[in-house]
Amino acid sequence: MDSTTEKNVLIIGGPNAGKTHFGGQLYGRLNSRKFNYKIAPHNRPSDLTIFQDVLDKLSEGKRAGHTEASANRSIELKLEDENENKIVFSFPDYAGEQVKSIVENRRINAIWKQYIDRSDSWMLFVRIDEIHPLEDIINRGIPSPEEIQKRRVQTPPVKVSDGAFFVELLQMLLYVKGVSTFNKINMPNLTVVLSCWDVPTFPENTIPSEILMKTLPLLYYFVKNNWAENSHSIIGLSSTEKTLSDEPDEDYIDRTPIDFGYIINPKGEKQEDLTISINSIVGK
């Protein structure tokens, strides 16, 4: 009797949320066979070029370019541990454009529904350095006479706050999966990933959940109030450890991409092995 298990992790995030570098760095670590997890040899996907392209760029000391909308295809990264338990990281929308469309159009297509139905765990990528505070009567400046006149002629569009966007997204995914919020959610396991953690230069031992509570309180309390304590986590992630550009970075050239990158675990501790987080992501 086969005692191995398979877990399915759904990767969720909009454009420029950090999924590209995460996928490439995870792929590089799995390929190196230096860690507890490896790419499943019998289920190796035929098309992993998008991950390899990221690694090639990083090996040159350059950032990987923004994934084009034309790359909105489904990608799966299948791995297994030393006991041959399998984990599938699914990227149904690698470029992230469809995530925006889901919320804007209140519609989830058939491909997304398949991935949602079979998922055990979700990774929600939130790029923490691009969260914009919502203007209100307290922090909004007085508009100029020209701006007032412009608003009289054309009413500005209503902008949904970042927190409301993510909450709406999670509510739609839960609805499609048939998960009620009347009771605390145990499955799917949820990991909120605060990506590009290195950009804001947080103090050492900063707790990721505290940052989420300050920057996106609506999302923070939605997660805290609806998921069971042992079925969700909030972590920080820097896939590249430093900001890269189109100019070569000598440190990356002298070393290898898998020597860079780290996570900040829920306790605020820095861990350089990105694969360490896999157990908590799948709810082990």
List PLM regions with ranges.
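Conserved G1/Walker A P-loop phosphate-binding module
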Residues: 1-69, 84-89
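Extracellular structured ligand-interaction cores
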Residues: 6-8, 72-74, 86, 119, ...
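Alpha-helix-centered segments that form part of catalytic cores
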Residues: 59-78, 160-177
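Amphipathic alpha-helical scaffolding segments
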Residues: 24-30, 96, 108-109, 139-143, ...
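Short, glycine/acidic-rich beta->alpha junctions
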Residues: 3, 104-107, 215
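Switch II of P-loop NTPase G domains
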Residues: 66-122, 129-138
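Conserved GTP-binding G-domain of TRAFAC-class P-loop NTPases and closely related GTPase folds
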Residues: 114, 121-125, 130-284
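Short, flexible loop/turn elements at secondary-structure junctions
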Residues: 15, 79-81, 95-98, 194-198, ...
